[in-house]
Amino acid sequence: MVGLIGQKVGMTQIFDARGCVTPVTVIRVEHNVVVGLKDVERFGYSAVILGTGCMKKSRISKPYAGQFAERIPPVRVMREFRGFTLDVSVGQVLDVRVLESVRYLDVCALSKGKGFQGVVKRWGFSGGRSSHGSKFHREAGSTGQCTSPGRTFKNVKMPGRMGAERVTVQNLRIERIDVGLGVVMVRGAVPGRNKATVFLRTAVKRER
C-alpha cells in the first residue's frame, strides 16, 4: 500500500483514443515529506507519517515544531499511512511518481457542509402531497411510539446539520498522471470543495 496527501483542483473531462469522454477529478500532489516512521517493536504496528504544506514561522508553536526531526521544516498537514510498502526514510520527499504502478485509489476527504437541513434533503424522505388539502408537505412525521416506550429512540432520522463529514470513495481508477504538473486524474467525483485536502491510498479492496 502507498499513500499521498493531495489537494483537489476541480473536475474536467478527457478523451481516450476512441474519442470517448471520461469525467475526471484533478488532484494536485505537492511534495510529501516523510515526517516520521513507526515500527512494530515500539508502537505495535508499522506506519509512515507524511506531511505537506508550508507554514509561516509566526504560526509555529514550540510544541508543534518539537515533533519534527532536525532539518525538516514543520508542515501544515500530516497523515499516518499504515502498511506502507515503499522503503522510505525520514526526510525523503515523495511525489506523484509513486502512483505510477497503482491502478485504483481510495480517496478520503471532508465533504461539503450543507448547514441545517430538513429530512427531505438530508435523508431523502418523500414528504407529503402538495395539494388536495394536504397539511403535510416536508415534515418529518412520527418519530416513535406512544406511551410505551414514551420516548424517541436513538439514531432516528431527523433534521440537523448535513455534510462536513469524512467520506471515502473507493476504487477510483487512475486515468492519467502528469509528473510535470504534479497532478493525478481519477475517474469520477471526489468529496470536498475545490482546494480541499484529500488523502490518497491504494484501493484496499483491489489488493485482495
Curated annotation (Swiss-Prot):
Presence of keyword Ribosomal protein: yes
Task: Alphabetically list the UniProt keywords.
Answer: Ribonucleoprotein, Ribosomal protein, RNA-binding, rRNA-binding
The record's annotation in Gene3D superfamilies points to: 3.30.160.810, Translation factors (2.40.30.10)
| Gene Ontology cellular-component annotations | cytosolic large ribosomal subunit
- Chain residue ranges for the region called Disordered: 134-153
Q: Which cysteines are joined by disulfide bonds?
A: none
Q: Does the keyword RNA-binding apply?
A: yes
Gene Ontology terms: biological process: translation
Superkingdom of origin: Bacteria
Q: Any idea what job this protein has?
A: One of the primary rRNA binding proteins, it binds directly near the 3'-end of the 23S rRNA, where it nucleates assembly of the 50S subunit.
Q: Which NCBIfam families match?
A: L3_bact (TIGR03625)
Q: Which family does it belong to?
A: Belongs to the universal ribosomal protein uL3 family.
The protein in question is named Large ribosomal subunit protein uL3
State the organism named in the record: Treponema pallidum (strain Nichols)
Designated gene of the protein: rplC
